[in-house]
Amino acid sequence: PLLFAWWLARRRRWGWFAVAIGVALACKEDAALAVVMLGLALAVLGERRAGLLCAAAGAGWFLLATRVLIPAAGGGDGPFYQELFPGFGNSLGEIVWNMVVHPSRLLELATRGDRLTYYWQVLAPVALFPLAAPLVLLISVPQTVVNVTSGHALTHDYRFHYTAIVLAGVFLATVEAMAWAGRGPTARRVLVAVLVATSVVANVAWSPSPLGRQYDDGIWARAEPRHATVRAALRVVPPTAGVSASYNLIPHLTHRTYAYEFPNPWRVTNWGAHGENPPDPATVDYLVIDERLLGDQRPLYERLVGPQGGYRKMFASDGIVVAKRGEKGWRVEADS
């Protein structure tokens, strides 16, 4: 929606522009930061009224979402990612304040080797063209700052979704830079050729696509006989039954009211922001387990499918197990 918003703004189609901005804001609260910068860029380019209204809408939504809506829905807690910025504080206000009053901390993080690699891998595929349109590239700046100051390594890894908003600004700046530099047909052809070349080279070097050198590095699951066993096991589970399943199986068992990644709900893991409001084990009718992936959860699993555990195996093949809750059995208590 950010790409469409810019395109519509450049054509002064303000009604549809407002729709695109609304969709962008509805995607995630931090998309508002990019919306603020997009609005300011439009204001600088001469669309002052629309740009400032856009920036105000983005800022207002960000404050409403982070200060009111998320705490209200989370029992008073702010956004969970506030904990991802060690050295800057434990609340949104502290984080922003310390970034402003201690710029050296921000600079130190932003210039580390892995961050410089991140910038290179984001900009090199588009031939560094966005640097020729710095005003538009500002759309990417807030999310880039968030990503490179975060203590979560995946946020400054170009392969993950955390870079999606950054890339929106990068591609918009690429288009604007090429429009500015490619004013003649020859220049446009050269710029397009350079862009295609750098994109293909970067794809081969860094992407997991069929063209990439990383295609066979284990990113994609290869077809194997065990997959037929998994499909057979999944067919055993009724579509409305509550399930707790291994992490590689649970995506295939969603679209139901109760679907948990094992060891949830007995042992609360990756649940909520802080493990609050743990689910009820009584909602689990079936276990669907890949025994090869149990690790330190094996004792819990063996208790559940043991004589007093309450679950009886209905399917077991090649380490894939489906167990159904029996009418009687010992219930394992949830713990955190």
Over which residues does each language-model region extend?
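Hydrophobic/aromatic-rich transmembrane helices and adjacent perimembrane loops
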Residues: 138-183
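Transmembrane helix irregularities
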Residues: 9-10, 23-31, 43-46, 63-68, ...
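Extracytoplasmic
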Residues: 209-308
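Signature aromatic-anchored transmembrane alpha helix within multi-pass, membrane-resident enzymes
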Residues: 56-60, 181-208
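Membrane-interface junctions at the ends of membrane-embedded or membrane-associated helices
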Residues: 10-17, 42-50, 174-192
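Membrane-interface alpha helices of multi-pass inner-membrane proteins
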Residues: 3-8, 15-29, 34-43, 57-60
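Aromatic/acidic, Gly/Pro-rich catalytic loop(s) in extracytoplasmic/lumenal soluble domains
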Residues: 289-336
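Membrane-lumen/periplasm interface segments of specific transmembrane helices
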Residues: 48-140, 175, 198-202
